[in-house]
């Protein structure tokens, strides 16, 4: 029996009167004959380095327990986390929240793990991991990005048996030094690969959501390329009135807590003391989305997971983002007016950056070979010194180890980097040609 228009009106009023981030499941909404369904999502860079201080993260175990309690209390539909580097931390967290989030997945990659994982209240029917072809430099041991093996992880989540959500979570290479950004070609290539991955795997999905720490600010080329090429919307920007963020020259205008800063916030206890005097917080954590076969409407996107209630500690050195979406699956989504930045100029700029990285890789290769030759000369020269034989033996061993690394980096490491940059450049060029 079809419900009357009066009954539908009453049901609609009930839904509108419910508080923000209500805790009803999709199944309950369907039982109430409501066609528009709600989806609540949260993302956080959890900052959980398992190594001991000063390398590891401060208060890691306590903070992770509080994050788990927050997840249980808030009853989100999907949770995306980054920098959960230890698989044992993931297992411990999944056991803590399993009563509410019975479905979860950790994306394994690299030597230390990708740190990326997903928790869901609804069945995860399939997963796919795409490791970025460029992940920094092997000899930058003090950074660690190369050992982590950054990825974008896709989880296909099925809700009520008929709604397919493609949920992506990722963590791109860190910036470290904006004025002398050695990793900019790598991060730009990662941004292009992310956009390509979403673009090709999202076909057929009802809802598409991309979350994570992109390590790029809203005006950066890589972020603008992700939005334009994958046709995604920035949830925070759509929920808050902001000026045009596409001007690199006015970068500082878009920093600060009021502008959605998620990192280096002065109200965070883990922020460096030098950054607490001025609010120069950066917005580098994002919630991106687009409609698939269903119409998706953003209801709100807000900062969350800042300070732990009743404590002077924060959940992480970043803050999280939460969003609430309304999904209308009564009819197939119709294409909206193109509101994205033109794609071609961004691709042309990106190919220039990637080509610059390719040239730098060739130069570095020669540099490392020269260093290897210098090590060989020093080793041979030390053979003519008969004083301190033990000391020179140790020196020769150390020079041999360093020299072998220089040869490996020049012959293998930089060749792999150059080929990955070349592949990214050719992929971009192919799109430009078409």
Curated annotation (Swiss-Prot):
Any GO CC annotation of this UniProt entry: endoplasmic reticulum
UniProt keyword annotations, A-Z: Hydrolase, Lipid metabolism, Magnesium, Membrane, Metal-binding, Sphingolipid metabolism, Transmembrane, Transmembrane helix
MF GO annotations: metal ion binding; sphingomyelin phosphodiesterase activity
Site feature: Important for substrate recognition: 215
Places the protein is found: Membrane
Pfam families, A to Z: Exo_endo_phos (PF03372)
Major location (coarse): membrane
Chain ranges passing through the membrane: 366-388, 392-414
Reaction it catalyzes: an N-(acyl)-sphingosylphosphocholine + H2O = an N-acyl-sphingoid base + phosphocholine + H(+); a sphingomyelin + H2O = phosphocholine + an N-acylsphing-4-enine + H(+); an N-acyl-15-methylhexadecasphing-4-enine-1-phosphocholine + H2O = an N-acyl-15-methylhexadecasphing-4-enine + phosphocholine + H(+)
Top-level EC class as recorded in UniProt: hydrolase
Binding residues annotated for Mg(2+), in chain numbering: 83
Pathway: Lipid metabolism; sphingolipid metabolism
GO BP: any one term: sphingolipid catabolic process
EC number: 3.1.4.12
Membrane disposition: Multi-pass membrane protein
Active-site residues annotated for this sequence: 318
Family: Belongs to the neutral sphingomyelinase family.
Alphabetical list of PANTHER family matching this protein: PHOSPHODIESTERASE, PUTATIVE-RELATED, SPHINGOMYELINASE FAMILY MEMBER
Biological role: Catalyzes the hydrolysis of sphingomyelin producing a ceramide (N-acyl-sphingoid base) and a phosphocholine. C.elegans contain specific sphingoid bases, which are unique or different in structure compared to the sphingoid bases found in other animals. Two examples of these distinctive compounds are: 15-methylhexadecasphinganine and 15-methylhexadecasphing-4-enine.
Protein name: Putative neutral sphingomyelinase
């Amino acid at each position: 029996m079809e419900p009357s228009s009066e009954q539908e009106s009453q049901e609609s009023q009930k839904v509108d009167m419910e508080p923000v981030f209500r805790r009803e499941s999709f199944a309950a909404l369907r039982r109430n004959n409501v066609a528009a369904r709600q989806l609540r999502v949260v993302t956080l860079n959890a900052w959980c380095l398992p190594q001991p201080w000063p390398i590891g993260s401060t208060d890691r175990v306590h903070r992770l327990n509080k994050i788990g309690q927050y997840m249980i209390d808030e009853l989100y539909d999907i949770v995306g986390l980054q920098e959960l580097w230890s698989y044992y931390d993931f297992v411990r967290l999944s056991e803590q929240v399993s009563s509410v989030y019975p479905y979860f997945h950790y994306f394994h990659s690299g030597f230390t793990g990708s740190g990326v994982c997903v928790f869901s209240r609804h069945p995860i029917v399939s997963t796919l991991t795409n490791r970025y072809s460029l992940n920094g430099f092997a000899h930058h041991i003090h950074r660690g990005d190369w050992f982590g093996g950054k990825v974008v992880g896709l989880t296909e989540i099925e809700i009520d048996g008929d709604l397919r959500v493609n949920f992506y979570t990722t963590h791109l290479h860190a910036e470290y030094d904006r004025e002398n950004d050695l990793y900019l070609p790598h991060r730009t290539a990662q941004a292009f690969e992310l956009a390509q991955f979403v673009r090709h795997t999202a076909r057929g999905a009802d809802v598409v959501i991309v979350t994570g720490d992109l390590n790029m600010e809203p005006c950066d080329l890589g972020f603008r390329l992700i939005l334009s090429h994958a046709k995604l919307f920035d949830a925070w920007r759509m929920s808050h009135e902001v000026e045009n963020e596409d001007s690199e020259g006015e970068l500082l205008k878009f920093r600060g807590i009021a502008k959605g800063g998620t990192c280096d916030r002065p109200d965070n206890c883990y922020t460096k003391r030098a950054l607490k005097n001025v609010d120069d917080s950066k917005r580098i954590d994002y919630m991106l989305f687009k409609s698939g076969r269903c119409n998706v409407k953003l209801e709100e996107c807000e900062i969350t997971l800042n300070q732990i209630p009743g404590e002077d500690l924060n959940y992480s050195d970043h803050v999280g983002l939460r969003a609430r979406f309304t999904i209308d699956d009564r009819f197939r989504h119709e294409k909206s007016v193109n509101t994205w930045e033109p794609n071609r100029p961004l691709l042309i700029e990106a190919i220039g950056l990637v080509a610059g990285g390719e040239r730098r890789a060739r130069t570095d290769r020669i540099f490392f070979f020269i260093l290897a030759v210098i090590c060989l000369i020093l080793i041979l020269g030390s053979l003519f010194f008969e004083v301190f034989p033990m000391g020179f033996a140790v020196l020769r061993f150390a020079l041999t180890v360093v020299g072998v690394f220089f040869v490996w980096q020049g012959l293998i490491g930089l060749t792999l980097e150059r080929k990955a940059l070349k592949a990214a450049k050719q992929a971009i060029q192919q799109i430009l040609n078409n």
